[in-house]
Amino acid sequence: MLQHKFVKKELIDKGWSGDKKYCVTDEHGNKFLLRVSPFEQYERKKSEFEIMNRVAALGVPMCKPLEFGTFDEGVFSIQTWIDGVDAEENAQNLTSDEQYFYGFEAGRILKEIHRVPAPEGIEDWEIF
């Protein structure tokens, strides 16, 4: 059951997942990312949420997982909101040096993420 009370909900019509994604705002003006998935994906989404907690504990700059559960629309997770711009739309506005810097930084962050062991039953991602 949702522990947060939201006063505003805006659909985010981007991204690669089939999840419904929303920018939600609480009564204090704080923004969060709300992801909603079908009930059938409960176990998978629970595992993703647990992995996100382990990755966040490493200090990786990311949306921090706050809450997970079910409600009348399906399985949900609530994460902290990070303001920013869409890299796909804005990368061409950066200099070559800036693009290199952000690409290098993304690789460094990905290396940190790979410190988290692959879950049981999933092929070890060290081979990638």
Protein language model annotation of sequence segments:
Residues 1-8:
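Juxta-kinase regulatory segment immediately upstream of eukaryotic protein kinase catalytic domains
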Residues 10-127:
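ATP-binding pocket architecture of kinase catalytic cores
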